[in-house]
Amino acid sequence: MPFLITIPAHAEWTRYAQLAESEEWFDPAIVRRDQDRITFWTMTNYTAPITSLEGQELLSEQALTTVDCSLGKIGSEKVIKYAGKNAQGAIIGSMETTLRMTKVSANAADRILLEIICAK
């Protein structure tokens, strides 16, 4: 069954990781919850421009992210790429895919995110 998902216009972003190449943020507002699966928006700000598959430079992206708290998995089904930081500026690309989830490793930044979201 199709459903409409909107991009958070006035999200209250919370930083959960500072890496050498990026800052990782999440919006604590839950888009959807289905038992142990929680869907919400994440945002990545890159410290330096990266080149997209389309050959354009981007500084940030948002992803519609789902975690499975019982299985310790994470995945994204929609990604929107922006020319500027904080999901600002021109949208230079987007992609929607079928949700494929992967196991989160113990020392990954996504482990921090999983623990925060699953504690809600």
Stretches with model-predicted labels:
Residues 8-120:
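N-terminal secretory-pathway/extracellular module detecting exported/lumenal segments
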Residues 1-6:
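Bacterial N-terminal signal peptides
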